[in-house]
Amino acid sequence: MKHLPRIILILLTVLLFTSCRKSHESPTRYTAFDDLFDHSKPIAFGEDEDIYVFCGQQIRSELEPVILASLEREVALVYNEKYFNVIFSDINEMERLMRFKNLLFIGTIEEGDPVSRYLQKALDPKLQARVKQSTGEIFQNKNRFVKDQLIVQVIGLDNERLADLFTLSANRIFDLFLDRYTKRLAYQTYQMQIIEQDFFEPYPFSLKIPNNYRLYANDKNNRFLSFLYRARIQNGKHPDKFISVYYEPMEQNVLDEKWLIDTRTHIGKVQFGDSLNVETLRTESFKFAGYQGFRLSGAWINPEKFAGGAFQSYAFWDEKTRQAYLVDTMTFFPEGGKLPVLMELFMVASTLKVK
């Protein structure tokens, strides 16, 4: 009996070690987007792609084509899809619409239209002074009234300067809303745990893949790795989602748009049995995961399986490792929009880190 305390101490030590080990080895979450929302505030209304726009009649008559061309820009996939849906709104509806996710105000600090008067009352005097000094500013406010919200205010000294400011800043305004949209998608995606990072030890890169994906292909000889999300119930209401990585040695950076198209075509044929619809292909310079490279968008088809869908591929060259990468995102979703799925996959693919 005199050894009982010692035995108990040893058992407690073993249990503590085992507990710590299990805690260390248990799946983890990727928390980069956890602070996106303010959970102390009410729930937000509206769709992620709807932007409620408030502006005076004179400004609308002048800027409506620019607003629509910027925010409702399209991308050609299986068919053209819009990023956003613009809803021009009356400022008198603000009490109701203040609970919605995306609000865009366009006004001045000198004109007398209702939207400008609203902004003049709402804007801090110091910010009004900035507008007077610069003749135009863009302000953003996150989660002002509800837990998930982006408010963008485009404010000029007068209508003439306001029109110039919006026209010159149209891409920036679009990017503000797009950034918020993609982060919302990422937040939802990463509410679950991710595949353990030990999985990627044999590879020259790592990814934060949600653990509801499964391994689709692991072709080590051809340096190709692919993951697939597929819903348990196959009723057409849930998309198939693919994330794939291909890499190859490349001593000098000769990566270009042709390399991207040729490599993606080869991967589709060898790994998926697919081909690309050349009429839909679009390439552009694009920054991905901190690298300047290229993006390829379009549609894929598989006649044998009577299947098809949309894809986006990202290519870049890593100088340190002297390797070229192609990161591919692909979806099969006959009954739904492909663009939001590809935006979600982009956020997952963007977690790629080259070792």
Where do the protein language model's features map onto the residues?
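Short, well-ordered beta-strand elements
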Residues: Q149-D158, F242-Y247, Q323-F332
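Surface-exposed amphipathic alpha-helical segments
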Residues: R161-Y187, L207, Y213, A324-K355
